[in-house]
Structures are given as structure tokens and as C-alpha cells.
Amino acid sequence: MHLFLTFVVYQFKRNAAIFLSLCIIGLVIFSIVFYRDPQRSVPIGENIIISPADGKVVSIDSVKGGEIPFTIKNGEIIYLPELKGIIEGNFTMVSIFMGPFDVHVNRAPISGNVIDIIYIEGGHFPAFGNVFTENERNIVVIDGNVRTVTVQIAGTVARRIDCFVNEDQTLEIGDKIGRIKLGSQVVVMYPSDSSTIVKIGDKVKAGETIIAQI
């Protein structure tokens, strides 16, 4: 009986050690894949707008001046009322879904000056007797040849957005502006008189794919 119990304990410890080792290896591989930041070949040109994110184009919408823009993330409508005073005239809004295997570093869609950064913490808030959920998001407004608005959208619980830039900072097209740590979506807005090149379903790369021509 003693030998049997000793054997059981040995096997448990051995399997637990193997399981723990596999978990550690998996975590290391996940971290390497998720936090990778490869070099990008940024296209040259003053009259182009490039993708701020890796991922898939899930929607292309028109926003009229004075309207409250919104996007849809995982079937949920996310209103962006903070943009109402920022965008003037008619804008095109391209939404890009970032999957778990996409690079999660975001880049400037144009060259210009950062004129505004707006951070919305997100979380769960009481409203009209119910709990209202608001997604964490960070908004970077860049003025260059045109004005672009890049919205990084994360989840509703933990802080998951890192912003790499500051207001009044001058950026070159393709410069890194931030990172979203977990499953996420990025929206880029630009004047509607620009010519949109991408279409819904296209795969795009941050800092490389041209999404519109000014």
C-alpha cells in the first residue's frame, strides 16, 4: 500500500511538473506572438492615408457633420459622442478588427501634429436603473494635409490601451502611436472627399497598407 501511494504521488508530481512546464512554454509563445513589433515598410507620399492597425476591414461608413459617429464591435454598437466637436464636415469612417494573431501596435495614418488626445476609461456605470457598459478607448487627432481621427477601442473591464504620443507632438506617417493589449478594434476617420481604396473584407497592415488617397 505504501509503495502504491508513493507511486501515485510521484506520478502526480511528474504530471503536474509537465503541465506547468507546458503552461509556461505556452505563455512565452503567446507573449512573443502577441507583443511582436515587426518593422514596416512605410509608403512614401504626402497625399496618402495608411492603415493605423493590422486586421480586417469590417465596415466603411459615412459620417455627416454634426452627427454622433458610432461603430460596431462584436455586434455591439459603440457611440463616439466625444468626436462630435472634433470632426467638421463629412467624414469617412473605416473600422478595422484586430484579431488575436494580428500585431497590436498602432501607427499614425498621416504626417502631422497631434492636436488632441482623448481617453475614455470605460467600465460599467448605472444608468436608468440598468448597468451601462462603455468600452475603453483612446482617440488621437492628427492635423496634417487633412485631419484624421484614430480611435483605439478595447474592452470594458481592465485598462488595456497604451498611448505612445502626446499633444503637440509632430509625427511622421507610420510612427507608432500606441498599442491595444487585448482583442480590439481601431477606427480611422478622414474627410469624405478623399478616395477610399480599401473595401470591406480586406486585410490591412499598420504602417503599410494605403487605405485612402487625399
What are these language model-derived features?
Residues M1-I214:
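Contiguous, well-folded functional domains in the mature portion of proteins
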